[in-house]
C-alpha cells in the first residue's frame, strides 16, 4: 500500500507579490537538528525534516551539512504549499541541558535564506528552567 499525500495550497491566488507566512521551528541540539514548518498557529505541520534523515552516519546528524540539506528539503515543500516567507523560532536543548544551540542552527537558517525564502522574525525559544531538577555534575561542579 502506498500512501499518497495531498498537497494543500496556502498561497494567495492574487499574485506572487503577497507574502504568505509560515513558522519554522529549528531545534538544534548537539546530537541532531530538526527543521519543522507549521502554519502561523503552530497546529498544522507542513513539513518536518531532521539531519538524521539526510545522512547515514550517526555522528553527522547534527552537522551543518545535514542541517543545510534538511532546510533545502523544507524549502521545496514550502514552495509547493505556497508559503514564501517564514518566521523563525530557534531552540537549543535548554532546561537542565545546554542553552547554546548546536552546530546546525546557523547553517539551517542560512540555507533557508539562500533558497529564496523571506525571513520575518527570528526568535529564541530555548526553555529556561525556573528552579528545576538537579543538574548533572557533583556538588563542586564539573572539574576539567
Swiss-Prot record:
Belongs to the universal ribosomal protein uS11 family. GO terms for biological process: translation. The keyword Transcription regulation does not apply. GO terms for cellular component: ribonucleoprotein complex; ribosome. Keywords: Ribonucleoprotein, Ribosomal protein. NCBIfam families: PRK09607.1 (NF007176). It comes from Trypanosoma brucei brucei. Residues 123-144 are annotated as: Disordered. This is Small ribosomal subunit protein uS11. Transmembrane segments: none annotated. One of its GO terms (molecular function) is structural constituent of ribosome. PROSITE patterns: RIBOSOMAL_S11 (PS00054). The keyword Transport does not apply. InterPro entries: Ribosomal_uS11, Ribosomal_uS11_CS, Ribosomal_uS11_sf. Residues 135-144 have a biased composition (Basic residues).
